[in-house]
A protein has these predicted regions:
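Short, solvent-exposed secondary-structure boundary/capping segments
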Residues: 44-53
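Intrinsically disordered, low-complexity, charged/polar segments
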Residues: 2-11, 56-74
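Short acidic/polar mixed-charge low-complexity motifs
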Residues: 32-33, 53-55
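Short beta-strand-centered aromatic/proline hotspots
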Residues: 32-42
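Short, well-ordered loop/turn sites that connect or cap secondary structure elements
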Residues: 20-21
């Protein structure tokens, strides 16, 4: 699904795992949108996500989430 975001950028919903999560992904947690600003590699394929609010979320290797991702076009 693609839709126009603020400023005319294209946004798409994507399924993410600890292997595919990126900085800038927008993940809805508990009904609140959280933007990933940093991430750290952990043991066994897990990653610790840091959101713009300062909150943390650990994604294990088998965790699957849906995120909104801005598509970059150059």
């Amino acid at each position: 699904m693609r839709e126009r975001a603020v400023g005319g950028a294209l946004a798409s919903t994507v399924e993410i795992t600890s292997a595919s999560v990126q900085r800038g992904d927008l993940i809805q947690v508990g009904g609140q949108p959280c933007r990933v600003v940093d991430l750290f590699q952990l043991a066994h394929g897990a990653k610790r996500l840091v959101f713009d609010s300062g909150e943390l979320l650990t994604m294990h290797a088998r965790t699957r989430l849906v995120a909104m991702r801005m598509l970059r076009r150059w």
